[in-house]
């Protein structure tokens, strides 16, 4: 049968049929009867439209080989044979220009003379049976149906056959020929029997047994049976007065719908209190890197070897001392912990063979910093369920904190460009389909805009730290393992670079559940003097550990080098998400893509190139107290990426709640801006839900202050 199809039909038709089958995951080599049926249907659609034109006087005419210069327009638009997206685009544009009702299913043709869509059917069964199936499926008075059979019969809506006798005879003759050719090869019987009816989904399938009982049990109040609930739903007119509808739904609801006007919304109330503090798992804008270019030392790529090599590039070490103590901690222990790291690194170098990993000695200072033996003893529930006054610990309410300016500075820094590239352009094979070509073009443009972005550095740093910590937590559960904080990048000249930010020492890590906590101490290099914004560093003990020579415009200057030390903790599930931070790139790329798609649909062509290469155009980036901030497309890419990265770095229940609840208010405000006259009820309750998430988290507080700027400017 496959050979017959390839001989019998025009190659273009065969190719279209193969494409259509592939789109539905069907194989022309296996489902050969279906292959033949699709080709036949395509050919009938093309023959239906062939030679039919509309002339200057809008009269329908038939031209088989006439004056090529005549001003003729095709009478039929062919929809069948296009890919789904394109086909719907054509249907939509016809509906928009002619005002014809949009069909529910894709039709085959559009007739510009009669102004109607046509559904063509070709059947191996009785024409009237097939006609009824088609009509039952499309359920539209507006779409005209025309059925042909291989026996020369036809049937059409209201016996209106659209075409002249001769054109239809051509189609019937061709179908008869196909049938004879098949029969002579012994293919007809199998082909005739393989036709399945139109698949229509029954509107009402009966529910019986357990499902029926469950349905009756789960009805809303005031409904006695599924039938009367169905009748109510079917008769429910969605437009009209909302209050009435609500009271119709339930006797308990009495919502007053208040119009939402420009004067309605008030700004969100941000909490008072001391300024909020840094709570990320590693330093961001304040981090300092010791690095080696073009690493080629022995054991290159083994973190401990790389770290020792980076440490050796710095010569300004000095006796460490505490410059900003941690309010609640035993600060000398932090100092001793750093001295221990230096001493143990020195010991490694004195050994003949450097080990691949380093477990720290379990000294008093590390046991204290890692909370060893601090956790209350776990008791099996069976042993204590009879205790009469068993209860959970009383926990204090979190203390409110106010928004501090450092978090906006952190965000601004994350949007900036660095002088290194943090991700490679993915080596992906040749594009096969045009859509892949557009996708990889977008990916390449986007990568070029964000590869040097500081937020991308944070992604790679986060992925590295979380991967290393999770590995060590599983591989060395009882050990206090020393984990270097490393990242890799390329310089402008394309040279490889390995960076060391500092070290982590992990505590005991018997992590059975996703939420079991592993404690760690982080020690990170920085040039930031903590005394400038002490509130930011509330959770840290900061040491001064050396002096660094920096090249500036006026020559070399010496700056003190600090070490930011703190106790921290994470869990398996947090590390798992940290390892997947690269998803932030994907999320922001998708946001940019939807902007490109919007442009492209207006211009009706792919706008990717223009979008990225038109440097003069500016785009809205965000709201600030000054109004809407605008910037280049690159700036938009980097801002969206930074938002996504900060959502990951500062993930918290407060952020989840704020995002979900503030979105509702945002949509209402946008509806007002679009003059949709929104109405609300219990707006106070919505404000309460949003504001209960504004406690002390720096990223949530910053988002809330941005939200207030948006409210101010959006509703001016």
Swiss-Prot record:
Keyword annotations of the record: Cap snatching, Endonuclease, Eukaryotic host gene expression shutoff by virus, Eukaryotic host transcription shutoff by virus, Host cytoplasm, Host gene expression shutoff by virus, Host nucleus, Host-virus interaction, Hydrolase, Inhibition of host RNA polymerase II by virus, Manganese, Metal-binding, Nuclease, Phosphoprotein
Locus of motif Nuclear localization signal 2 (NLS2): 184-247
Comment on bound cofactor: Binds 2 manganese ions per subunit.
Main localization category: host cell
Gene Ontology terms, MF aspect: endonuclease activity; metal ion binding; RNA binding
Motif Nuclear localization signal 1 (NLS1) positions after renumbering to this chain: 124-139
Similarity annotation: Belongs to the influenza viruses PA family.
Quaternary structure note: Influenza RNA polymerase is composed of three subunits: PB1, PB2 and PA. Interacts (via C-terminus) with PB1 (via N-terminus).
Protein name, as recorded: Polymerase acidic protein
Lineage: Viruses, Riboviria, Orthornavirae, Negarnaviricota, Polyploviricotina
């Amino acid at each position: 049968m496959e050979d017959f199809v390839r001989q019998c039909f025009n190659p273009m038709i065969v190719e279209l049929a193969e494409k259509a089958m592939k789109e539905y995951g069907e194989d022309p080599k296996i489902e050969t009867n279906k292959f033949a049926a699709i080709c036949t249907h395509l050919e009938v659609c093309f023959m239906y439209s062939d030679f039919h034109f509309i002339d200057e006087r809008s009269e329908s005419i038939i031209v088989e080989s006439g004056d090529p210069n005549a001003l003729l327009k095709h009478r039929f638009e062919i929809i069948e044979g296009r890919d789904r997206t394109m086909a719907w685009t054509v249907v939509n544009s016809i509906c928009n220009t002619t005002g014809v009702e949009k069909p529910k299913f894709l039709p085959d043709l559009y007739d510009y003379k009669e102004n109607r869509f046509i559904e063509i059917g070709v059947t191996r069964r009785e024409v009237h049976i097939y006609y009824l199936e088609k009509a039952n499926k499309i359920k539209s008075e507006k779409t005209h149906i025309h059925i042909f059979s291989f026996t020369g019969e036809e049937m059409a809506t209201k016996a209106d056959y659209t075409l002249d006798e001769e054109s239809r005879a051509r189609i019937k003759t061709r179908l008869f020929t196909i049938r004879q050719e098949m029969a002579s090869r012994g293919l007809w019987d199998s082909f005739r029997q393989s036709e399945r009816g139109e698949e229509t989904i029954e509107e009402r399938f009966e529910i019986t047994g357990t499902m029926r009982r469950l349905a009756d049990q789960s009805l809303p109040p005031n409904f006695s049976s599924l039938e009367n609930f169905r009748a109510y739903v079917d008769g429910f007119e969605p437009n009209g007065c909302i209050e009435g509808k609500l009271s119709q739904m339930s006797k308990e609801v009495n919502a007053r719908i208040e119009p939402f006007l420009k004067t309605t919304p008030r700004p969100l109330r941000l909490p008072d209190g001391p300024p909020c503090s840094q709570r990320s798992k590693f330093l961001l804008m304040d981090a300092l890197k010791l690095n080696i270019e073009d690493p080629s030392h022995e054991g290159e790529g083994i973190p401990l070897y790389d770290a020792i090599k980076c440490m050796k590039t710095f010569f300004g070490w000095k006796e460490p001392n505490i410059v900003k103590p941690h309010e609640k901690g035993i600060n000398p222990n932090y100092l001793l912990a750093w001295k221990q790291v230096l001493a143990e690194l020195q010991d490694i170098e004195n050994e003949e063979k450097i080990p691949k990993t380093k477990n720290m000695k379990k000294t008093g200072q590390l046991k204290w910093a890692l909370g060893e033996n601090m956790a209350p003893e776990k008791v099996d529930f069976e042993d204590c369920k009879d205790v009469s006054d068993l209860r959970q610990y009383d926990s204090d309410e979190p203390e409110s904190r106010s928004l501090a300016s450092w978090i906006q500075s952190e965000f601004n820094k994350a949007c900036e460009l660095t002088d290194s590239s943090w991700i490679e352009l993915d080596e992906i094979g040749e594009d096969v389909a045009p859509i892949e070509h557009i996708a990889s073009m977008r990916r390449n443009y986007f990568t070029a805009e964000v590869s040097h972005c500081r937020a991308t550095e944070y992604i790679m740093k986060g992925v590295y730290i979380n991967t290393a910590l999770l590995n060590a937590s599983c591989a060395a559960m009882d050990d206090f393992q020393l984990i270097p904080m490393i990242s890799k990048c390329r310089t402008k000249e394309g040279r490889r670079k390995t960076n060391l930010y500092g070290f982590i020492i992990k505590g005991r890590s018997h992590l059975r559940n996703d939420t079991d906590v592993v404690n760690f101490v982080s020690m990170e290099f920085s040039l930031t003097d903590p005394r400038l914004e002490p509130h930011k560093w509330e959770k840290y003990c900061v040491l001064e550990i050396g002096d660094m020579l920096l090249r500036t415009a006026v020559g070399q200057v010496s700056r003190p080098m600090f070490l930011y030390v703190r106790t921290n903790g994470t869990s398996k599930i947090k590390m798992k998400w940290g390892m997947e931070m690269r998803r932030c790139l994907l999320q922001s790329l998708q946001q940019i893509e939807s902007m490109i798609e919007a442009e492209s649909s207006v211009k009706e062509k792919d706008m990717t190139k223009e979008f990225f290469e038109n440097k003069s155009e500016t785009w809205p980036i965000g709201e600030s107290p000054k109004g809407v901030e605008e910037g280049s497309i690159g700036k938009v890419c980097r801002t969206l990426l930074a938002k996504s990265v900060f959502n990951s770095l500062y993930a918290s229940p407060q952020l989840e709640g704020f995002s979900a609840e503030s979105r509702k208010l945002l949509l209402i405000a946008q509806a007002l801006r679009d003059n949709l006259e929104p109405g609300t009820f219990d707006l106070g309750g919505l404000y309460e839900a949003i504001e209960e998430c504004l406690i002390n988290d720096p990223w949530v507080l910053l988002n809330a202050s941005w939200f207030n700027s948006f409210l101010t400017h959006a509703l001016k």
